[in-house]
Amino acid sequence: LISAFSKAMGEKEEKSQQAKTLEYDFSGKHILLVEDNMINTEVAVMLLKSKGFSVDTAENGLRAIEIFNKSQNGNNDAILMDIRMPIMDGLTAASNIRHLSNGDAKTIPIIAMTANAFDDDIEKSKAAGMNAHLAKPIEPDKLYQTLYDFIFEQDK
């Protein structure tokens, strides 16, 4: 009986978790995805578009700065930034974005995505001006919740 109850509760919790995932709707929101690995980019774009995001991509930090700097104020709702990339890494790019004169450069949520999830790595990303740190492989629910928290809290 206890086993059946635990199983039923587990299924109920799983269904509740699935329902929570389906609640996210980012229609009309725009994100800049900065990732040098093509497979990671394709997977992330698929995950983001499935929840309504429109997505621009950049393969390195320098390209991300160029795209962000050319965008109109408020065009991007968030930036997802890999840390280790060629040409310019994510920490340097985030720091440079924070120093741009673009109107939302100081406030746009920049979220690190990296395999490096030690306390020291998290501190480095925050020191560079990033708002949050997601460990790879990215868990979709955690990604959506983090984006929701930053984007919709910012809209209030």
Model-derived features: where do they sit?
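C-terminal compact regulatory domains
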Residues: 1-156
